[in-house]
């Protein structure tokens, strides 16, 4: 799922030198090479389960959902803090519950192609496209899409508040493009507000190993379906586009003491789930339900 992830800028320089004294002369030694502050290899796996709840239209019954996502990227240094990033991703939704004719799964396999400015492992500005196939079962030419996003970060108050602006879109997205962004407020050394949509968060880091946060998520992805023949008979479509969304609020904690891995666990409420067949003006909504999540990230 494509979203517009953005982070704050914190620039620093480091240098070291040493001098060895002789009887009458001093010889300067070359400064050691500073360690790489940005990871080159990025790995992420996530699974999120939303428990069963009813459709707004009772004839459709009930549904639960399981979301899985795997991605791997590698950064290639261009110059300074500018990188070219390339990678792959596979994501999949599986739906259980009533056999009502709606898709029982949706999936996507895509590439990542990006140019970004990276500071301390955080993307401060960049542009990315994710070309790939977004489909139900059949991989075909009309299942190809290329979601894109562009973003930039700027200081509003030195070392305290930053503004983020961004846009994103896709060929089969509705609307075809949408804004994102917000502000980052460094409240203290341990507390910050990342008011960045589509994934705002209030983050507390008591130390280098623990990360606690209250989060929100707006997740929207469009897929090419096969036959959609619902039991209520108002929705009978072939080869249609559906924009599926899951919007959540919750809390999560992460532990990064096992370098280079970060282990993440979270829970909350999926407040809205929806199958939006926008070209046919048909939406199928599902009531709120609790969710649980586990994830693992690695940067090296």
Spell out what each predicted region is.
Residues 74-76, 117, 154-156, 169, ...:
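Residue-level signature of outer-membrane beta-barrel architecture
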Residues 181-185, 190, 253-259, 286-300:
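Outer-membrane beta-barrel "beta-signal"
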Residues 61, 92-101, 198-271, 275-276, ...:
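Outer-membrane beta-barrel translocator/channel fold
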Residues 71-73, 112-116, 149-153, 182, ...:
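Outer-membrane beta-barrel architecture
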Residues 43-51, 86-92, 127-133, 165-169, ...:
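Transmembrane beta-barrel strands of outer-membrane/channel proteins
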Residues 59-64, 103-105, 135-143, 168-177, ...:
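Solvent-exposed loop/turn segments connecting transmembrane beta-strands
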Residues 78-84, 121-127, 159-163, 190-193, ...:
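Repeated loop/turn-to-beta-strand initiation elements of outer-membrane beta-barrel proteins
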Residues 22-147, 239-248, 281:
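Transmembrane beta-barrel domains of bacterial outer-membrane proteins
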């Amino acid at each position: 799922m494509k979203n517009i992830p953005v982070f704050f800028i914190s620039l620093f320089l480091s240098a070291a030198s040493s001098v060895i004294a002789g009887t009458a002369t001093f010889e300067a030694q070359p400064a050691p090479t500073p360690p790489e502050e940005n990871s080159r290899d990025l790995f992420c796996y996530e699974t999120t389960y939303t428990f069963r709840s009813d459709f707004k239209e009772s004839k459709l019954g009930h549904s639960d959902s399981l979301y899985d996502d795997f991605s791997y990227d590698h950064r290639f240094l261009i110059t300074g803090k500018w990188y070219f990033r390339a990678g792959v991703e596979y994501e999949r939704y599986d739906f259980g519950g009533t056999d009502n004719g709606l898709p029982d799964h949706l999936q996507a396999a895509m590439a990542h192609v990006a140019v970004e400015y990276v500071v301390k492992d955080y993307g401060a500005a960049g542009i990315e496209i994710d070309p790939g196939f977004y489909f139900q079962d059949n991989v075909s030419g009309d299942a190809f899409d290329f979601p894109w996003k562009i973003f930039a970060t700027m200081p509003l108050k030195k070392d305290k508040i930053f503004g983020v602006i961004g846009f994103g879109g896709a060929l089969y997205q509705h609307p075809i493009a949408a804004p994102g962004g917000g502000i980052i407020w460094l409240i203290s050394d341990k507390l910050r507000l990342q008011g960045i949509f589509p994934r705002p968060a209030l983050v507390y880091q008591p130390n280098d190993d623990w990360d606690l946060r209250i989060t929100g998520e707006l997740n929207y992805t469009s897929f090419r379906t096969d036959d959609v023949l619902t039991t209520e008979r108002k929705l009978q479509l072939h080869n249609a586009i559906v924009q599926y969304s899951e919007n959540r609020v919750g809390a999560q904690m992460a532990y990064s003491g096992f370098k280079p891995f970060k282990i993440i666990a979270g829970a909350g409420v999926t407040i809205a789930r929806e199958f939006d067949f926008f070209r046919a003006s048909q939406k199928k909504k599902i009531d709120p339900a609790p969710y649980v999540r586990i994830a693992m990230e690695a940067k090296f």
